[in-house]
Amino acid sequence: GMSISNPSNFYSFVNNQIDPAPNSYAGKELSFVREMSKQTQKFGEVIKAANAKVTTQSPYPTSNSLADQLKIVARLIKGGLKTKIYMVNYGGFDTHSNQTVAGDTSIGYHATLLGNVSNAIKAFMDDLKFQGVEERVIE
């Protein structure tokens, strides 16, 4: 790993290739970092282009971080990316208190989390259908 305190300096460091990397271990590492930076920039441009192709989507629930992530995934799928697997994350399930209300498992923190998951997935599937790309996703 590496720590970057100033992104502008890092950008200049990896893109300023007036001086070739020295023929040393550090030079090999510098060449690797420069190449990864170039590839990341190219991949970023492809992702931006795919995202820009989508101008309308069906509605998603608000205040739902999983729905926000799935909305982006739907845009990238519709935008033409050939990515086979997208990874999203929705935490908060490791609770040990107030998971449900005694006598009613449909009320409580855990029930709310599961409701958010359900609403996010439904919105995602509805959006894929709206976009005409539902056949590109395995349920």
Regions found by a protein language model. Give the residues of each.
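His/Asp/Glu-rich metal/cofactor-coordinating catalytic motifs and the adjacent surface-exposed loops
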Residues: 133
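Feature for exported/extracytoplasmic and membrane-associated proteins, marking the mature portion
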Residues: 1-119, 123-130
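Acidic/histidine-rich, metal-coordinating catalytic segments
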Residues: 136-139
